């Protein structure tokens, strides 16, 4: 049973890592080489100058340097290739960039030492001498990558459950072997030999697990065309996991040998164990298992809520498949931080965004990123607030006029015409009818919020005036949420604030000055053409169809839920193993006492009163800790019920077995 578990757990971990490496291959590659990331430069330098300097450096140190090149295909997806400096060859698994891609790419990128004697310090010094600043140095660290992949949320829970299961299986195995080992010990077998035999058996199981995991990893990398740099990650994961199991094996084998020495020889022949120590370990394991199930149920409830919130927008998104989001690169970030180039950059982007809006683009800016799953937030200006509060930071949706048409917001033609004719210094304030009596107050709040102020914020440069309109109550407004910060897709009866780029004149503003996750452009091909015409192509790192970003988030949520559920089943299976082991040991210690009490007429609960008391103590302690961790009483109650029922059923099952052995026990066996 233990060997089968070791093999299956290695298969599970390897399969998970194959999926991670497949979906984030560029991250695996980045973590496989010494790298320097460049974020800004303080002087102009040409591609040829960089190529000459890095070629020379690579040849001097007999090394190969690679620059990561990002290219965007016709569907807007990013592909990575590598420009090579030096006379060496590109490592297998990397795609060599074409000369055209190299010269069309930016200079602010990642530079890797792919092979050779070159050090990161020298490469960093060379890059800084070319005028590059704000460099970030990273060394390859497989174990850090493993911690990133396995040290979060559900993955960590599953790993702990695996370790607990292994402990339970070891105790069961050692319990069954105790009588045989006792006979061998009495026959003259030394304790070191007993320890050695135990370790050899466990090492054989773990070696088989490593071979299975690595073989599956190599086959998976080849079959699914995953980057070959995944193999060291999978190999390291398999070694690390099995070393953890080996540590547990050494620890329990050592305790096993000590227990043999501590127990009387006659007791050994009967298969007795030092039950106090082992029961203590099992109670601790049971407590951990209890807490793991609490966390599993809690996380499942959270992700179920997330899934419901996210899926609420599925139908709405399915009719909105051609909206495009733009992602910017490091060149954009560097120029935005540069005081000299910032003004020109702002003008360039304002012009592009205005053209994009005129060609069907849309602003839909919501406040959801500031609120938790319960719809609560703490704002530095407004204090504690709910998503349903009516203020500029809560139940407000900032949109362009075409949102009203796309989402069929109920307005008459006269109101639509008035909104479309908004001029400089004007915006539309669409209030649900239930807020009519608060019109003056809300008008003042939003006019003050949208007013353009100077850098110090104490003087209004441009006042903003609201045109007020009324819309129906009890409406849910689709917010086009494709960000992973929040999963909600609708706001209930929000105030709609209608804005146009021209509303702010030439002033810098928070809506139409820079790209954001709230600006959507119409059609992939049309957006690419606008980017080309606007002269901002060099700043774009990626075109994303918002619908597929949303679908990707749905997939990630599903995977997380399935991982949590799988972890939950494993946790329950582990707890059953622990309970079963405890009941075996419990009857081993108190078999005759239980039988005598049963003959005297005590019922089931009176017979096992001591056992139930300890279980209740575990439940109370686990429940208290679980309540502190989750603040969810129903989760703790449900877990206690599951564990309590599990305990009673296993105890009843074992009790029936013991009844069949009653005649043997009375004879003194």
What residue ranges belong to the model's regions?
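Membrane-proximal extracellular/periplasmic loop immediately following the first transmembrane helix
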Residues: 23-86, 300-408, 413, 417-418, ...
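N-terminal membrane-entry
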Residues: 143-162, 236-244, 551-579
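Interfacial "coupling" helices/loops that link adjacent transmembrane helices in transporter permeases
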Residues: 167-203, 578-614
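Internal/C-terminal transmembrane anchor helices
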Residues: 271-304
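C-terminal membrane-exit region of the final transmembrane helix in multipass inner-membrane proteins
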Residues: 242-275, 642-669
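Short helix-loop junctions at transmembrane helix boundaries
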Residues: 214-242, 616-644, 649-659
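"Rare, low-scoring activations can occur
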Residues: 43-146, 426-564
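Selective transmembrane-helix segments that form parts of the transport pathway or gating/packing helices
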Residues: 5-12, 192, 196-217, 241-248, ...
């Amino acid at each position: 049973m233990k060997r089968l578990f070791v093999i299956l757990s290695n298969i599970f971990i390897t399969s998970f890592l194959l999926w991670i490496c497949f979906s984030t291959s560029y991250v695996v590659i980045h973590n496989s080489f010494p790298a320097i990331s460049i974020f800004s430069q303080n002087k102009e330098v040409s591609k040829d100058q960089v190529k000459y300097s890095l070629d020379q450096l690579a040849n001097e140190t007999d090394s190969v340097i690679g620059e990561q090149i990002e290219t965007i295909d016709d569907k807007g997806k990013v592909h990575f290739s590598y420009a090579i400096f030096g006379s060496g060859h590109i490592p297998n698994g990397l795609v060599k960039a074409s000369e055209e891609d190299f010269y069309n790419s930016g200079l602010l990128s990642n530079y890797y030492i792919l092979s050779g004697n070159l050090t990161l310090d020298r490469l960093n010094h060379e890059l800084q001498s070319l005028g590059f600043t704000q460099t970030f140095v990273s060394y390859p660290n497989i174990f850090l990558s493993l911690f990133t992949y396995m040290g979060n949320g559900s993955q960590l829970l599953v790993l702990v459950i695996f370790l607990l299961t292994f402990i339970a299986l070891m105790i069961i195995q050692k319990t069954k072997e105790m009588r045989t080992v006792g006979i061998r010990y009495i026959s003259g077998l030394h304790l070191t030999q007993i320890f050695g035999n135990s370790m050899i058996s466990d090492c054989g199981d773990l070696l088989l697990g490593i071979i299975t995991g690595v073989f599956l990893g190599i086959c998976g990398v080849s079959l699914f065309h995953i980057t070959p740099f995944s193999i060291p990650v999978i190999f390291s994961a398999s070694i690390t996991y099995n070393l953890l199991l080996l540590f547990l094996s050494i620890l329990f084998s050592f305790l096993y040998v000590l227990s043999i020495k501590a127990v009387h020889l006659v007791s050994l022949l009967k298969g007795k164990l030092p039950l106090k120590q082992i029961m203590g370990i099992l109670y601790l394991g049971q407590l951990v298992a209890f807490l793991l199930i609490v966390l599993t149920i809690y996380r499942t409830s959270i992700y179920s809520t997330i899934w419901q919130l996210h899926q609420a927008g599925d139908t709405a998104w399915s009719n909105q498949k051609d909206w495009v989001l733009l992602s910017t690169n490091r060149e954009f970030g560097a120029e935005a931080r540069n005081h000299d180039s910032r003004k020109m950059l702002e003008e360039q982007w304002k012009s592009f965004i205005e053209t994009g809006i005129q060609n069907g683009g849309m602003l839909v800016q919501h406040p959801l990123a500031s609120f938790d799953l319960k719809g609560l937030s703490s704002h530095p200006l407004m204090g504690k607030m709910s998503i349903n509060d009516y203020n500029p930071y809560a139940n407000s949706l900032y949109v362009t006029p075409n949102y009203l048409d796309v989402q069929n917001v109920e307005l008459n033609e006269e109101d639509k015409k008035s909104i479309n004719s908004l001029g400089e210094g004007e915006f539309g304030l669409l209030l649900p009818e239930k807020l009519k009596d608060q019109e003056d107050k809300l008008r003042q709040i939003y006019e003050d919020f949208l007013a353009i102020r100077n850098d110090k914020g104490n003087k209004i440069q441009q006042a903003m005036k609201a045109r007020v309109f009324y819309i129906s109550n009890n409406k849910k407004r689709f917010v086009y949420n494709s960000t992973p910060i929040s999963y909600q897709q609708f706001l209930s009866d929000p105030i709609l604030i209608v804005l146009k780029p021209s509303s702010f004149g030439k002033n810098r503003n928070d809506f139409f000055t820079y790209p954001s996750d709230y600006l959507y452009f119409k059609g992939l091909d049309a957006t690419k053409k606008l980017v080309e015409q606007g002269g901002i192509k060099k700043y774009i790192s990626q075109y994303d169809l918002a619908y597929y970003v949303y679908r990707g988030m749905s997939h990630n949520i599903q995977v997380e839920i399935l991982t949590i559920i799988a972890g939950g089943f494993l946790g329950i299976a582990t707890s059953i193993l622990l309970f079963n082991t405890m009941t075996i040991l419990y009857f081993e210690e108190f078999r005759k006492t239980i039988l005598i009490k049963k003959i005297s007429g005590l019922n089931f609960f009176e017979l096992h009163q001591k056992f139930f008391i300890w279980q209740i103590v575990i439940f109370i302690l686990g429940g208290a800790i679980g309540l502190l961790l989750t603040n969810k009483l129903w989760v703790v109650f449900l877990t206690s019920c599951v564990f309590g029922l599990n305990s009673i059923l296993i105890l009843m099952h074992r009790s029936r077995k013991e009844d069949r052995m009653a005649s043997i026990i009375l004879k003194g066996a």
